[in-house]
């Protein structure tokens, strides 16, 4: 099936009452793991990477093109519908480069801005992306971040959400409704009433960030209230590190190191980390209801 528009993937999810995960990758192995899981589960995929927890000098030197190019090539070869997302870019210039390198969906990290500034910046992104055939996600409201003692949250106001979407023509709206960035363990309390109120007045699919902290029992009720996409990342990195550490500990003394680094075989310690991510993402696709929808 290959490259697909994110807005089409999310429209189908919203209509069907399920969520599609954006599983945030950071390199070749994690990108491949996400696509392998999608093909195994026959789930639509949103492949991509983010700028929020990635070194900015590296991204600005060549990282945007490197990761966007990898994700695009995988999407083109996919047997399921696959979009390519640059998530939470720090600048409009990064978005410009991401679009040129193959991303067909973008999001500017603008939720910290005052409403008027966020509105103006989002309009600039839409003016870049839509003529290039790319979709735009924006976040309105502000999530807490578990890395910084929670911080302050600003829940999304339904009336503001409606006006913002109408004024910007974005394709997806990330909302603050109880989820928390970088929280593990499914302890977030999702405000389902707020989701219902927003979905009733907003024409585009809703998105929840902070997926690692969303309890499993809240996922399908959120999907029934307009949420079509969940962003997920924290536990993927933990799974990768656990698989890598376990594999590295088992490398025999005096072994041919080529068998364990870069071989792309089952012995390769990086492939072992990739397998852990694939297993985790596959299970989440089942939980989100997207398995079997491609």
Where are these regions (language model features)?
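C-terminal alpha-helical cap/extension of soluble enzyme domains
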Residues: 218-294
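Short catalytic-loop micro-motif centered on adjacent basic/acidic residues
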Residues: 20-24, 84-85, 107, 206-209, ...
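A short N-terminal beta->alpha junction/helix N-cap motif
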Residues: 1, 18-26, 58-59, 268, ...
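Short N-terminal signal/transit or membrane-insertion segments
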Residues: 22-34, 183, 256-269
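Alpha/beta enzyme core
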Residues: 4-16, 28-55, 62-79, 89-204, ...
């Amino acid at each position: 099936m290959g490259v697909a528009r994110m807005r089409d993937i999310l429209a189908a999810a919203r209509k069907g009452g399920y969520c599609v995960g954006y599983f945030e990758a950071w390199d070749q192995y994690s990108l491949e793991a996400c696509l392998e899981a999608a093909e195994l589960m026959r789930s639509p995929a949103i492949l991509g990477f983010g700028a929020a927890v990635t070194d900015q000098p590296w991204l600005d030197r060549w990282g945007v093109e490197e990761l966007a190019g990898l994700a695009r090539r995988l999407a083109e070869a996919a047997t399921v519908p696959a979009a390519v997302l640059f998530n939470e870019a720090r600048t409009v210039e990064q978005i410009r480069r991401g679009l040129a390198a193959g991303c067909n969906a973008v999001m500017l990290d603008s939720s910290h801005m005052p409403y008027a500034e966020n509105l103006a910046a989002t309009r600039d992104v839409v003016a870049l992306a839509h003529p290039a055939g790319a979709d735009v996600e924006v976040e309105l409201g502000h999530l807490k971040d578990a890395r910084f003692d929670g911080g302050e949250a600003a829940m999304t106001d339904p009336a503001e959400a409606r006006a913002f979407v109408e004024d910007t023509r974005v394709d997806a709206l990330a909302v603050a409704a109880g989820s928390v960035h970088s929280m593990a363990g499914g302890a977030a309390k999702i405000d389902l009433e707020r989701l219902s109120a927003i979905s009733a007045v907003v024409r585009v699919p809703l998105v929840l960030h902070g997926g690692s902290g969303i309890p499993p029992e809240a996922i399908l009720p959120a999907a029934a209230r307009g949420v079509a996409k969940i962003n997920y990342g924290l536990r993927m990195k933990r799974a990768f590190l656990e698989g890598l550490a376990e594999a590295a500990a088992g490398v025999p003394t005096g072994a041919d190191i080529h068998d364990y680094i870069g071989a792309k075989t089952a012995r390769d310690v990086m492939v072992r980390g990739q397998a852990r991510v694939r297993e985790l993402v596959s299970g989440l696709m089942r939980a989100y209801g997207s398995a079997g929808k491609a």
